[in-house]
UniProtKB/Swiss-Prot annotation:
The lineage of its organism: Eukaryota, Amoebozoa, Evosea, Eumycetozoa, Dictyostelia. A divalent metal cation 1 binds at residues 491, 527-528, 639. Inhibited by 3-isobutyl-1-methylxanthine (IBMX). Keywords: cAMP, cAMP-binding, Cytoplasm, Hydrolase, Metal-binding, Nucleotide-binding, Phosphoprotein. It holds the Pfam family Response_reg. Binds 2 divalent metal cations per subunit. Site 1 may preferentially bind zinc ions, while site 2 has a preference for magnesium and/or manganese ions. It is an enzyme of class 3 (hydrolase). The keyword Flavoprotein does not apply. This is 3',5'-cyclic-nucleotide phosphodiesterase regA. The phosphorelay mechanism involves the sequential transfer of a phosphate group from Asp-212 of pde2 to 'His-65' of rdeA. Phosphorylation of Asp-212 activates the phosphodiesterase domain. GO terms for biological process: cAMP-mediated signaling; lateral pseudopodium retraction; phosphorelay signal transduction system; positive regulation of chemotaxis to cAMP by DIF-2; positive regulation of release of sequestered calcium ion into cytosol; regulation of protein localization to cell cortex; regulation of release of sequestered calcium ion into cytosol; response to osmotic stress.
Length: 793
């Protein structure tokens, strides 16, 4: 073994330079166009200049290429006594040496590898966010997918990219020359840490990792574990190498933790190729089989789908034939010409034998004839008769109206407002604290918003056309993202209904004007408009288009406010067109402040300011600043009101918001951003999140609410009971009787906690809630003021 090593050292020292690679396989930043890449490119100018110096020596290095290859063959023969291919082949490799003298090779290797790493402008993917209005925010960030080789071709070493990690310079060079002879594409790195950087952040994707076991910082086993634990890279096969005395133990450990194979140094050339080809050919073949099976399944699915479509088309043709036949008979009956009608009436008159007996009937028929002949649209009655026929389906009626009716307008193509009709009891229910928003669909909820506006006479006072109010509500609904678990239209309605309860059942309207209430209802509906499901912290860390647009300040709240007035600027949704200039300015100022007040980063500032005013000064309804403070307080209470709802509603909302939190922390981890601690599923639970939110955020706010609005004092007991329930869940989790993920499958969330808590006095709570819900404010009365506002008290 010593003789072998001496011969290797002698060969290496006799060669002062080695062939320069024809092309680098290390990641490059040439294609990057981001601001981050440009800055990194400027910082690494020196690195590029060093790379150019290496290129100047390329010609001299190539002159020695054949000699080096011949000498390398001799080295290989020392290990396995086998002959090698005499053909010199240039392959794409990434070297980790500057090819200087043998004495400085180790330091230069490390420097060049570090330069290669620094020269890569890695950019964790944050998909979407390419629009100032956040139109692409629903494209949630995901890690780059592993390169899938072209498995339609046969396996070939020239298609294989191998990453070699070894801290021994000599071993790296030997492996490099061995693998080059078999036409593999090779990237060399001096340690596991750099290898992981290349795998995880480099632009190059690898088909195999060949790593030494004993390396500083990150061992071969550590690198293997990281690859196996990663959702994207876990499919990369790993072969470990070692030359120590406990190889058999390393071999067993390699298989146990998911490695593909183990090699003992020194490695024979043919054995190395056989091991690599065995691993990769099996993967190649397996993926070809999977691809073939997937193709067969797709073809089978297409065949079944086509058969079903043919069957459906035959049924549609049969139904269409029946419909055409039916329509033919209907049209003959309905679409008769006016002259036919007149002729028939006259013929009936002529058949009368004695006109004197039918004088009244004759006058009636003649009057009908004159009316038909004098009509400006004498065909219209027949057309309307056809439209009203019950045998004509809605689609056909819509087609006839849109194509043949002179009253058709562009609005006929726009979706119509849901026409759900509610009785008086339902309209009273939305004033109650126990209103369950989850029992209604979005189409059911939208008409209730119109009722809220009408209850305060806002359409009459501010001249709001009902059609435009409906169009505004539908547009707001459309801009909320349906795939969000928490920040969706249901949440927006829930906040609006809560604030509506404050105004009516809790008598908060007495402190406000009609214009204040108008602004408050708009703000509640729009306060989370187009929310992407990721909070401001994520926007700033990811440097999304929205964070750049609003300079990292209340990013989402500014976005919600901007979209609100963008909708209101549309002529079909402009419910502010009846306001004068002063009213519009005041409403806009108020709406912007209200939506910005929902930014939780400013929560304690708003809360403390309100508490200080409440403790020291009475609120003056004539002061605009006092009314705005009340408005901000009401929308903030509404925004987090789910903690004061009955237990089953608080439970459902808490699950939904924690789902969004956990989703954000998951993507923060993948993208390498700082993980928000209270959202990290590995460090907290749903019950812990809910309990902490009650303790530190919601409870102080609703204590002020109870002092400000006496009718709301019973909410403190509801909050206390909810807090006890969450505490019970935390204790059950500590005892191992309840798993955090099990909470989302519970039909009755009170079952588990009953064993830990005294029975809830449901009757007492129900009486208190119903007594508060039954009280509502009297209709608002109009009073004139300097700016044409009306009082809401």
């Amino acid at each position: 073994m010593n003789n072998k090593q001496e011969e290797i050292d002698q060969f290496l020292s006799s060669t002062s330079t080695s062939p320069s690679p024809s092309s680098s396989s290390s990641p490059s930043n040439n294609d990057s166009t981001s601001l981050k890449s440009m800055i990194s490119g400027i910082e690494n100018l020196n690195v590029h200049s060093k790379g150019n110096d290496n290129k100047n020596n390329n010609n001299n290095n190539n002159n020695n290429n054949s000699n080096n290859n011949e000498k390398q063959k001799d080295i290989v023969s020392l290990e396995n006594n086998s002959s090698s291919n005499n053909t010199t082949t240039t392959t794409t490799t990434t070297t980790t040496s500057n090819h200087n003298s043998n004495n400085n090779s180790n330091n230069n290797n490390n420097n060049i590898n570090n330069n290669n790493i620094n020269n890569n402008n890695y950019e964790p993917l944050v998909n979407g966010h390419n629009n100032g209005f956040g139109d692409k925010l629903n494209d949630q960030p995901s890690p780059s997918s592993h390169r899938v080789s072209d498995f339609s071709d046969e396996y070939s070493p020239s298609k294989v990219r191998i990453l070699v990690a070894d801290d021994d310079d000599v071993q790296r060079k030997i492996l490099n020359n061995l693998l080059k002879k078999f036409h593999y594409n090779v990237t060399l790195v001096p340690n596991g840490e750099i290898a992981w950087e290349y795998i995880n952040k480099g632009q190059q994707k690898y088909d195999l990792v060949l790593t030494d076991v004993m390396m500083p910082h990150i061992t071969g086993f550590d690198l293997l574990q990281r690859i196996n634990d990663h959702p994207v890279h876990r499919h990369i096969p790993v072969i470990l190498m070692s030359g120590t005395a406990v190889d058999y133990k390393y071999a067993n450990d390699t298989i146990k933790i998911g490695g593909q194979d183990f090699l003992t140094k020194p490695i024979a050339k043919e054995l190395l190729k056989k091991k690599i080809d065995t691993v990769l050919q099996s993967i190649w073949q397996r993926r070809k089989e999977e691809e073939y099976k997937a193709t067969l399944a797709q073809e089978r699915e297409k065949g079944n789908k086509l058969a079903k479509e043919m069957e459906l088309k035959e049924h549609e043709i049969e139904e269409l034939t029946k419909k055409v036949s039916k329509m033919s008979s209907i049209s003959k009956e309905a679409m008769e010409s006016p002259l036919v009608s007149v002729t028939r009436n006259i013929e009936e008159l002529l058949k009368q034998s004695s006109w004197s007996h039918y004088e009244s009937e004759i006058k009636e028929k003649l009057s009908s004839i004159l009316k038909e002949l004098g009509s400006s649209n004498i065909y219209r009655p027949s057309f309307e008769k056809l439209i009203k026929n019950d045998s004509v389906d809605p689609v056909t009626k819509s087609f006839l109206v849109s194509e043949f009716s002179s009253t058709t307008s562009r609005r006929n193509s726009i979706p119509t407002f849901p026409q759900t009709t509610y009785n008086r009891d339902t309209k009273e229910v939305i004033k109650g604290w126990e209103f369950d928003v989850f029992k209604y669909s979005e189409d059911d909820l939208m008409p209730l918003l119109v009722d809220m506006f009408e209850n305060f006479q806002l359409p009459e006072i501010f001249k709001i056309p009902i059609e435009k109010l409906q169009r505004f509500i539908m547009t707001v609904n459309a801009l909320y993202r349906k795939n969000n678990r928490y920040h969706n239209f249901t949440h927006a309605f829930d906040v609006t209904q809560t604030v509506y309860t404050f105004l009516t059942s809790f008598n908060a309207a007495q402190y406000l004007t009609h214009l204040d209430i108008f602004a408050l209802l708009i703000s509640c509906m729009c306060h989370d408009l187009n929310h992407p499901g990721f909070n401001n912290t994520f926007q700033v860390n990811a440097q999304t288009e929205l964070s750049l647009e609003y300079n990292d300040i209340s990013v989402l709240e500014n976005h919600h406010a901007m979209l609100t007035f963008k909708i209101l600027r549309n002529s079909e949704c402009n419910i502010l067109e009846g306001l004068n200039e002063d009213q519009y300015k005041e409403l806009r100022r108020s709406v912007v402040q209200l939506i910005l007040a929902t930014d939780m980063q400013n929560h304690f500032e708003h809360t403390n300011k309100f508490q200080h005013h409440l403790n020291n000064l009475p609120f003056d309804r004539n002061k605009k600043e006092d009314r705005q403070m009340i408005l901000n307080f009401l929308i903030k209470c509404g925004d987090i009101s789910n903690i004061a709802r009955p237990w089953h509603l608080n439970f459902e909302w808490s699950l939904r918001v924690s789902d969004e939190f956990f989703q954000q922390s998951h993507y923060e981890t993948i993208c390498g951003y700082p993980v928000t601690p209270f959202m990290d599923k590995t460090k907290t639970t749903r019950a812990r999140i809910a309990a902490d939110f009650i303790d530190f955020v919601a409870s102080p706010l609703f204590q002020s609410m109870a002092k400000f609005l006496k009718e709301s004092q019973f909410l403190l007991k509801v909050i206390s009971k909810n807090r006890e329930n969450w505490q019970a869940y935390m204790e059950l989790q500590k005892e191992g009787k309840c798993n955090d993920d099990d909470l989302q499958f519970m039909e009755d969330p009170t079952i588990l906690v009953k064993s830990k808590l005294p029975k809830i006095d449901e009757e007492e709570n129900r009486d208190k809630v119903s007594s508060s819900s039954s009280s509502s404010t009297a209709p608002l009365t109009s009073t004139s003021s300097s700016n044409n506002e009306t009082s809401s008290s």
